[in-house]
């Protein structure tokens, strides 16, 4: 390639991690001779994750005594490489369980995981319990995101009848 030609290659923010070969061909306007050069480009890995409830779900849910409720948690791989995320729950008193404690997600994609919160007979109407969910990247353990949820035992409404004599 002749002197004086500058070629700039820039990866977009959603470029997928990896090595790429770029072939550049050009010819002078006064010649039919084609010149070619190959360039290599490396897109560095970027790990990123975010957690959210699906479809605008509320971070405060409700449950009955000795029952369970579920939350649909969306795990977003905001990074540019396939990644596996470890999901943990902490700070809670009630039983809290993910259907999958690890999820593998393609770059710039997401997966929904069901979180189940279970109460027993020891809770009372109006009680609540908070939990902090954390998703941690296995590609880079320093990358994580958290989401806080609160579950309340539904207050029992009804009528009470008593007789008077």
What are these language model-derived features?
Residues 1-165:
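Long beta-sheet-rich domains in secretory-pathway and surface-associated proteins
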